[in-house]
Amino acid sequence: ANMNAVIFQVRQGGTAYYESSYEPWGYYAGYQNPGYDPLAAAIEEAHSRGLELHAWFNVFQTSSTHDGSPAAEHPEWICRDQNGIPMSSYRSLSPGLEDVREYTINVAMEIVRNYDIDGLHLDYVRWNEHTNSQRNNPTVDQELERLDGMINKNEIEYLISNMSGRYLYDYQHPYSAGVPDGFISWEEWWRWSVTTFVKTLH
């Protein structure tokens, strides 16, 4: 059917669908060992049919607070708003924390080293979003001038509104402390943190 690969979700919200030494079994496994290794079984079935098996890996998204999940074990890792309040839903771990980057790389490498996967697909490899309406933003006219009219005013307003609604800080890098040392803007630091994670994993 013109198909050559299967994308199989191995990590969801800080839980696993394989034999993990780091994280608990996921929701669709009933938060318990299903009696077999879903990833190993999927790889065997895919390869027996001449298909590649690519592991779909949620990176910083950590919605689960089940025992053993990173959000439950390390609530300090969860992204915070300008007032230092952590996300309470659609949680995301902060890419800005070295402990988060190191932990997540260890989880990913557990899969790479222990399973005969043909690819690792990184999902949610970014800062997450949601309610934070207080961050100062450029005016629409300033953004339009910077972009030289490449997109229209409505699109700019949407982008600014979306940015102002994001949890973009953590307990080591609170908004109140200002831009982290060595960076000229929060945007530069946000980009650096995610890029550093990807480069290190690679």
What does each model-identified segment do?
Residues 1-15, 114-119:
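Catalytic domains of carbohydrate-active enzymes, especially glycoside hydrolases
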Residues 18-30, 61-87, 125-178:
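Aromatic- and acidic-residue-enriched segments that line the glycan-binding/catalytic groove
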Residues 54-115:
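Active-site-adjacent "subsite" loops/lids of carbohydrate-active enzymes
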Residues 12-58, 181-202:
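Aromatic-lined substrate-binding rim segments of carbohydrate-active enzymes
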Residues 116-121, 177, 184, 188:
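Solenoidal tandem-repeat scaffolds enriched in leucines and small polar residues
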Residues 5-7, 50-54, 90, 118-121:
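Structural preference for beta-strand elements that scaffold enzyme active sites
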Residues 9-14, 57-61, 123-128:
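Short, solvent-exposed turn/loop segments enriched in Gly/Ser/Thr/Pro and often Arg
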Residues 112-129:
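Extended hydrophobic secondary-structure segments
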